[in-house]
Amino acid sequence: TGEKPYSCSDCGKCFTRRWNLSEHRKSHTGQKRFCCSVCGKGFSYHSQMKSHYRTHTGEKPCICSECGKSFTDHAGLRIHQKYHTGVKPFSCSECGKCFTRRSGLTAHLRIHTGEKPYTCTECGKCFTCRTDLARHLRIHTENKPFTCSQCEKSFASHSDLDRHHCLP
């Protein structure tokens, strides 16, 4: 029926099964039970770690039948496919901008509130989202976990690797 009666009291995400909610709740504990063997990044779920690991290998086995774009996991593909349908169920009450994902709306709302809840412990710079802080932290650590398979040059972010054009 599509009904999702089980909702997370921390973030509001809803689930069809109690077990899925129980598994999801583990993500709020902060415990990272699975670590990437390449860069050491921790994850709450094995599936997250496996998907992340593919960013190092470049493997993107999930392919969109509409446009051919590929993804490291099925979740990324499902989110992408919403762009083809044009469905954006999450809208900003301030400006009306709509989003495919709830997390997109949550991050967007911080533009209006000015909230920057993620702070760098090295320099004090603040960020609106966790991924921006994680990318920034690599400046301090010189961690460059994304390596070109052609020339072995390393990059601090996956987007920097994608922009890199190596001629074999």
Curated annotation (Swiss-Prot):
It is found in: Nucleus. Keywords: DNA-binding, Metal-binding, Nucleus, Repeat, Transcription, Transcription regulation, Zinc, Zinc-finger. PROSITE patterns: ZINC_FINGER_C2H2_1, ZINC_FINGER_C2H2_2. A zinc finger (C2H2-type) spans 6-28, 34-56, 62-84, 90-112, 118-140, 146-165. Its main location: nucleus. The keyword Transport does not apply. One of its GO terms (cellular component) is nucleus. The keyword Transcription regulation applies. Pfam families: zf-C2H2, zf-C2H2_11. InterPro entries: Znf-C2H2_11 (IPR041697), Znf_C2H2_sf (IPR036236), Znf_C2H2_type (IPR013087). One of its GO terms (biological process) is regulation of transcription by RNA polymerase II. One of its GO terms (molecular function) is RNA polymerase II cis-regulatory region sequence-specific DNA binding. PANTHER family: ZINC FINGER PROTEIN 142, ZINC FINGER PROTEIN 322A. Belongs to the krueppel C2H2-type zinc-finger protein family. May be involved in transcriptional regulation. This is Gastrula zinc finger protein XlCGF42.1. It comes from Xenopus laevis.
